[in-house]
Structures are given as structure tokens and as C-alpha cells.
A protein has these predicted regions:
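Structured alpha-helical segments in the cores of large, soluble enzyme domains
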Residues: 30-36, 73-80, 108-112
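Glycine-rich, histidine-containing beta strand-loop boundary motifs that form or position
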Residues: 55, 84-88, 135-137
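Non-catalytic terminal extensions that flank enzyme cores
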Residues: 1-58, 126
Length: 151
């Protein structure tokens, strides 16, 4: 049995993965990505690849944001839908901005605007190659969220 998840991909599929993860040291779920590129269903049931990145709004932009933006840009270019979770409740739990949710919310606004600029204002939405920002507080306000947590 071959343990290399990329072994079943053709050259085009391997090139796509190389472009998506250029510069990345570790890729979690590469087997799933390779399977979807090969035609299998994604976790959501279709053929759309989705990436989720959770970030705590906790301060000013720094060099690391540019590195992350480059990877996000690579994913968007390969038609991956990228969701950036602005983990505002995590910032609150971790005592950022003295647990002032108004300041944390302002930091989340700042963070999303900086990433829009770094990514040259990509199209936003739920489709292929689109970017979406969502706050943990928005998700937690959803009845679906709590239904899932309590099950």
C-alpha cells in the first residue's frame, strides 16, 4: 500500500497542490485535498475545497500576516474557498485588550481590512476562489452552532 497521498494524482494535480502550498512546511489533510482534486467529494459533499484559518484579533499587523496572506492568495488562485475565522471569543478568553469586546471587535475589523489589502481585495463569498471572514461570536449566536455543540 502506498502511503504517499499524492501518488494517485496526475502531473496537473500535483502542480496544483505545489502552487497551493508553496512555502508551507506542514500541510494537515493533504490526503483529503489530493482526493478532492482527483474527483472525490469534499467533506461538505461537493467538489469544492474549503480552507479554514482561525486567527485571534489581538494586535497590530506584523510580518507573519504577510506570510499567511501569501498562502491564502495561493489557495484563492487555485479556486479554494477560504474562510478566516476571527476568533473574538478566544481573544476575550485570553484576556486581550483587557477583555473589552468593543476593542476586540475593532481589532477584528482591522485584521480583516489588512488582509483584504494584502490580498488585493479578492472577491468575497462562499464560492470557489472567494474569501470570507466570520467571527466566532457570529457563529456562536447561531442556533445551529449550539445544536451541534450540545449533540
Amino acid at each position: 500500500m502506498n502511503s504517499n497521498p499524492l501518488s494517485n494524482l496526475d502531473d496537473e494535480g500535483r502542480s496544483k497542490i505545489d502552487r497551493m502550498f508553496n512555502g508551507c512546511e506542514e500541510i494537515v489533510g493533504i490526503g483529503h485535498v489530493a482526493n478532492v482534486i482527483s474527483g472525490s467529494s469534499s467533506h461538505s459533499g461537493g467538489n469544492q475545497l474549503n480552507a479554514y484559518i482561525g486567527l485571534e484579533p489581538s494586535g497590530k499587523a506584523h510580518l507573519g500576516w504577510m506570510v499567511l496572506a501569501e498562502t491564502i492568495d495561493n489557495l484563492l488562485a487555485e479556486k479554494v474557498n477560504v474562510t478566516v475565522l476571527l476568533a473574538d471569543w478566544h481573544a476575550w478568553v485570553n484576556d486581550k485588550f483587557s477583555r473589552d469586546m468593543e476593542k476586540i471587535s475593532l481589532a477584528a475589523d482591522y485584521m480583516s481590512e489588512v488582509f483584504r489589502v494584502l490580498l488585493n481585495f479578492p472577491e468575497e463569498g462562499d464560492g470557489p476562489g472567494q474569501l470570507r471572514f466570520i467571527r466566532a461570536s457570529e457563529m456562536m449566536d447561531s442556533g445551529k452552532y449550539w445544536e451541534r455543540v450540545l449533540r
